[in-house]
């Protein structure tokens, strides 16, 4: 009986944690998720790491938009991001930059 209670408690915590987790915007899932994740480095850096790198810096959103638009490595030493990821529009890039910078 104790095992069942512990199992249900752990399962409940897992589901509660996933419900509270930040979800990647649909455009990011479609055009960025092959190389990026919110919490984990994949091919490119985790977006929370990107947010931390630019936190409190003047012009952070503009810089991030420029990086996403032009492509490159940006000092991450993880490889080269292609320009515009997988064909994101200017509006999608601006929205994505805003999303990334709000991550904690």
Predicted features by range, described:
Residues 36, 69, 101-104:
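Protein kinase-like catalytic domain
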Residues 1-23, 104:
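N-terminal export/targeting leaders of redox proteins
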Residues 22-23, 31, 46, 64, ...:
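Hydrophobic alpha-helical segments typical of transmembrane helices
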Residues 42-54, 70-95:
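Axial heme c-ligation environment in periplasmic c-type cytochrome domains
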Residues 23, 60, 64, 89-96:
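Stable alpha-helical elements in mature extracytoplasmic
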Residues 15-28, 53-57:
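Electrostatic cytochrome c docking/interface patches
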Residues 31-38, 96:
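The canonical Cys-X-X-Cys-His
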């Amino acid at each position: 009986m104790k095992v069942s209670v512990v199992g249900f408690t752990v399962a409940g915590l897992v589901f509660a944690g996933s419900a509270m987790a930040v979800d990647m915007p649909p455009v990011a899932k479609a055009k960025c998720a092959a190389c990026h994740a919110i919490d984990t480095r994949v091919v490119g850096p985790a977006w929370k790491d990107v947010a931390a790198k630019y936190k409190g810096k003047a012009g952070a959103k503009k810089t991030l938009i420029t990086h996403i638009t032009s492509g490159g490595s940006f000092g991450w030493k993880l490889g080269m991001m292609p320009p515009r990821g997988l064909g994101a529009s200017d509006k999608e890039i601006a929205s994505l930059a805003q999303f990334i910078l709000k991550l904690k």
